[in-house]
């Protein structure tokens, strides 16, 4: 909402979903100031919009409007200013109330980690193991039953206690707890 230039542009990059208002502007102006991108922008930005587009925005320091940001894929949704919080709540409700929290957490780790692999082989191996363990979970049973009964699912598994033992990133999720 408003100008996101420099660190304002980079700090939103790690977000899974980015919502902008029609008055938003984005600028990666670091080279114009004699410095380089920060906030891991050199890692996130090319993953989000591609290397050539990331280079163009960083080389030029051009400030773009919200329409161009949406077109580039820098933001996922474009709304009017008075609809920003409504859209955020709508999406959070959609993601948090209709999907298994454990499956969402696992999917996030899998996509961020496995998309960096050189080939799909490791993704296939990990997915094959995890579909079996998650397929036997209470959440999977609830997901199927809610579909068959045409009702909303009520997932009971918790990230803190129900991540499968064979989930490769299990220890890194709970590292901060120790």
Tell what function each PLM region has.
Residues 1-102, 137:
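Crotonase-fold acyl-CoA enzyme core
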Residues 2, 30, 129-131, 177-178:
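Proteins with a high burden of low-complexity, intrinsically disordered sequence enriched in S/T/G/P/A and R
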Residues 19-24, 66, 75-126, 132-138, ...:
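C-terminal long alpha-helix characteristic of the crotonase
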Residues 41-44, 53, 106, 127-130, ...:
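Hydrophobic alpha-helical segments typical of transmembrane helices
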């Amino acid at each position: 909402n408003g100008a996101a230039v420099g660190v304002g542009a980079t700090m939103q990059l790690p977000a899974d979903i980015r919502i902008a208002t029609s008055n938003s502007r984005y600028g990666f102006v670091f080279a114009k100031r004699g410095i380089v991108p920060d906030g891991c922008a050199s890692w996130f930005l090319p993953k989000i919009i591609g290397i050539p587009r990331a280079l163009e925005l960083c080389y030029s320091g051009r400030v773009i409007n919200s329409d161009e940001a949406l077109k580039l894929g820098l933001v996922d949704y474009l709304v009017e200013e008075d609809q920003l919080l409504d859209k955020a709540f709508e999406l959070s409700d959609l993601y948090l109330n209709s999907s298994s929290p454990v499956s969402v957490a696992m999917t996030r780790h899998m996509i961020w980690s496995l998309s960096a692999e050189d080939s799909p082989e490791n993704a296939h191996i990990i997915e094959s193991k995890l579909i079996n363990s998650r397929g036997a979970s209470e959440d999977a049973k609830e997901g199927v039953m809610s579909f068959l009964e045409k009702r909303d699912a009520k997932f009971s598994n918790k990230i803190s206690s129900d991540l499968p033992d064979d989930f490769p990133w299990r220890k890194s999720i709970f590292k901060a707890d120790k």
